[in-house]
Amino acid sequence: MDVENGEGQVQVHLKTKQEHYAVPDVPYAIDGTVTTVELNTFVNALLRQKDGSSDTDFDFLVFDEYLRGRLCDHLREKAISFEDAIEIEYVERFPAPEPQDCLLHDDWVSAVKASGKWILSGCYDNTLNLWTNKGKHILTISGHTAPIKAVDWISLDEETGRFVSTSQDQTAMLWQWNVGSNSVECVSVCKGHERGVDSVSVSPDGLRFATGSWDTMLKVWSAEQEDAAEGSSKRMKESGVRTPKITLQGHRESVSAVQWMDASTLLTGSWDHTLKVWDLSLEGIKTEISTNKSIFDASYSKLNRLILTASADKNLRLYDPRTNQGSVVRNTYLGHNAWVQTVMWSTTEEFLFVSGAYDNQNKLWDCRSPKAPLYDLLGHGEKVLDIDWSNPKYIVSGGVDNTVRVFKSRKALAEDTEAK
C-alpha cells in the first residue's frame, strides 16, 4: 500500500495536556487520509468508552502545527517518515467569538482600548468616546484639534479612570474621568513631537507612557498626576504642559507601534521595516530585527515572549527577539486579502491573537496554525483600523465604517452559559 499517497495506515499516539480528556496511551492504527473530522469522531468514541462523556470538539496538533488537511499531506510537508509512530496532540477547540454590539460613531474609529466595564474609542473627528462594554454611550470628549491615532488606559477603579490619547495634532493628552459624576478633564497636554503621534503605550506600573511619532522619535513621559513639566518654566507648569523625560532616536520613518515589554524595555515597530527593542536604563537599542515590509503594528506577548507584526502586505509574521538570527521569521500567517493594519496577542491565552485588516475583517488566530485563522470575525463594512483584546472577555475593533464592533470571547460566553 502507498501510505504516502494516503493509502494504508499510520501508527499514532494520542496525547493531551487536558487530563480529563486523556485516552489510553497506546498506539492506534489510523488511515493516512484522516482529517480533523475523522480524528474528532475517533477520540470522542474512545472517551465515550472510557467514561461515557458527551462529544467535544477538538483541534489536533502534529509536530506543533494545527492539522488543516489530510494527515498524510501534513506529514509529507513536514518530511516525516510514515513508518514512524506519530504523536498527535489534541486540545479542546476554542469557541467562536460571538458578535455582541455595534457602537456607532460620527467618523472613522482609529483607536480602541477596553478595560473593566468600559471601552475607550478615538475618532477622526478629533473626539474620544467612552462606552460601557454592553454598548451604552457614556461621554464624548473634545480637546484634540486633529484625528485621534491611539489611546491607552493608565488606571481605573470604581471612582476614577485615567487615560492617555495621541493625535495628528502632535500632542498626547492625559485625561481624568470622574466615574460617579461622569465628568472628564484634560490634566496635561504633552508636547515635544514635531509630527503626528501615531502610537502610545502605558508602562506596567502606570507611572510612565511611551509615544511613537511620524517625526521618527520615541519619547517617554511621566504619567504621574503631579508631574506637569517638572523642571520646566512656571508658565508651562500652570498650563499643564508636559515635556518628555526621554527622547530616543533610531528609526528612520514613522514609529507606528510601541509597547512596554517590561518595566525598563520597550518594543517599537516602524515604517522603516524594522522592529527595535530599547533598554531604557541605557537609553539605547538592545535588539534590532529587520523585516521586508513597513510595519503598521506590533504586539509582544508576556506569556510566550514572541512578537507579531502587521505589515504592508496581506501577512502577519512571528519573531523571537531572543534569537541571534534577528531577521529570521518564525512563522507567517496567511488569511487576510489586504494590508493588515492591527494585531494583538491575547493577554490570557498563550497561543491566541487577533488581527484586523483593510479587507474589512477581523480574524482570531492560534500561532500554531499559520495556514488559516481559527475564525473570521465579520461585521465591519470598511477597513479595520484598530483591534484590542485587553479585556479577556471582549474583542473590540474600530474601523472606517464609523463603528466599534464588540465580540464576546470565551470568558464572556462561559459567563452567559452559567447565567442561563
Curated annotation (Swiss-Prot):
One of its GO terms (molecular function) is ribonucleoprotein complex binding. Keywords: Nucleus, Repeat, Ribosome biogenesis, rRNA processing, WD repeat. Belongs to the WD repeat WDR12/YTM1 family. Residues 10-92 are annotated as: Ubiquitin-like (UBL) domain. HAMAP family: WDR12. It holds the Pfam family WD40. Its main location: nucleus. This is Ribosome biogenesis protein WDR12 homolog. One of its GO terms (cellular component) is preribosome, large subunit precursor. It is found in: Nucleus, Nucleolus; Nucleus, Nucleoplasm. WD repeats lie at residues 104-142, 143-185, 192-231, 250-288, 290-329, 335-375, 379-417. It comes from the Eukaryota. GO terms for biological process: maturation of 5.8S rRNA from tricistronic rRNA transcript (SSU-rRNA, 5.8S rRNA, LSU-rRNA); maturation of LSU-rRNA from tricistronic rRNA transcript (SSU-rRNA, 5.8S rRNA, LSU-rRNA). Required for maturation of ribosomal RNAs and formation of the large ribosomal subunit.
